[in-house]
Amino acid sequence: MKNVLSIQSHVVYGFAGNKSATFPMQLLGVDVWALNTVQFSNHTQYGKWTGMVIPQEQIREIVTGLDNIEKLQECDALLSGYLGSAEQVDQILFALEQIKLRNPNALYLCDPVMPHPKKSCVVANGVCEALIEKAIPVADIMTPNLHELRQLTEFPINTFDDVLKAVNALIAKGVKKVLVKHLGSAGKINDPDTFEIIMATPEGVWHLSRPLYQFNFEPVGVGDLIAGTFLANLLNGKSDVEAFEAMNNEVAGVMKTTFELGSYELQTIAARFEILNPSSNYKAEKVA
C-alpha cells in the first residue's frame, strides 16, 4: 500500500481539505496520513466559522515523531493544500526534506490554495508569496486553478494560449507536472456549460473537458479532491495521462452525484461507487 502525508485544512462539518481528499484516496487504495494546518468548524466560504490555525511548530513535531518511529521511509508522497500561515510553508519544506532523506523517490504535490477575488476563501497574509518563493522550486506537481496560475506566474492570462505560456513557465522552473483546474473564460472551448482542465508535463499538454454543473452555490473542496485523486492514481502506477483521465472521471461522478442531491457540500460518500468504478469515460486530448 502506498502512503501519503497530507498537510492541509480540516473542517468538522462538510468536505474541504483533508476531509475532501482522504476518503477518496483511501477508496483508491492509498493510505492518507492526515496532518491538519487548521481546524475549523466549517469551510470559510460560509462567511462565518470558528476554530484555529495549528501552531507551525506542531507540524515539525509530528513529522519528527513519524521519523522517530521510522515511518517516513514508508511515505511515498507529500501533499500540501490550504495553509493557515506563511510560516507553515517552511514546515512543509521541513517535512519534504525529512521525507526525501528517508525516501528519495517520494513525490511532492503542492496544491497552492490562494485567495480568490470572487470567492470568500480566506488565506493568511504572506502565504502566496511564500508558495511562489519556496514551493515552486521543489514541487514535483502543482495543481493551481486559473486565478492561482496567474498569481504563481504573474502572467496576464485571458486566452488558452496564455494558459499554455504560463504552465510552460512553471515547467521551465522545474515543476514536472502542472494541472490547471477549471480554465473558465481562458479555456480552449470557452463554453459556460463545460469544465475544462489541462495537464502539462515536459512531454506536452493534455486537455480534457466534461460537463460543468450549474450549482446555486459552488461546492468547496473540489480542488482538494482533484489533487488527491490524481496523486493516488499516479501512486497506483498509472501513467500521467491515465492518472489524469481516471481522476477526471472519478471527480465527474462526485460532481454529478452532488448536483443531483442538490448539496452545497461534496457528496464523496454518496458517490463512493463512482470513485471506485466511474460511470463516465472522458478522454484527454494532446494539444501541445
From Swiss-Prot:
Cofactors demanded by this protein: Mg(2+)
Annotated binding of ATP, by residue: 111, 148, 181
Which GO molecular-function terms appear in the entry? ATP binding; magnesium ion binding; pyridoxal kinase activity
Q: Which SUPFAM superfamilies match?
A: Ribokinase-like
This entry carries the following GO cellular component terms, namely:
cytosol
GO BP terms: namely: pyridoxal 5'-phosphate salvage
InterPro entries found in the cross-reference section: PM/HMP-P_kinase-1, PyrdxlKinase, Pyridoxal_kinase_PdxY, Ribokinase-like
Q: Which Pfam families match?
A: Phos_pyr_kin (PF08543)
Which keywords are on file for this protein?
ATP-binding, Kinase, Magnesium, Nucleotide-binding, Transferase
Organism domain of life: Bacteria
Give the multimer and partner information.
Homodimer.
* Chain's role: Pyridoxal kinase involved in the salvage pathway of pyridoxal 5'-phosphate (PLP). Catalyzes the phosphorylation of pyridoxal to PLP.
- Say which family it is in: Belongs to the pyridoxine kinase family. PdxY subfamily.
Q: What is this protein called?
A: Pyridoxal kinase PdxY
Species annotation: Haemophilus influenzae (strain PittEE)
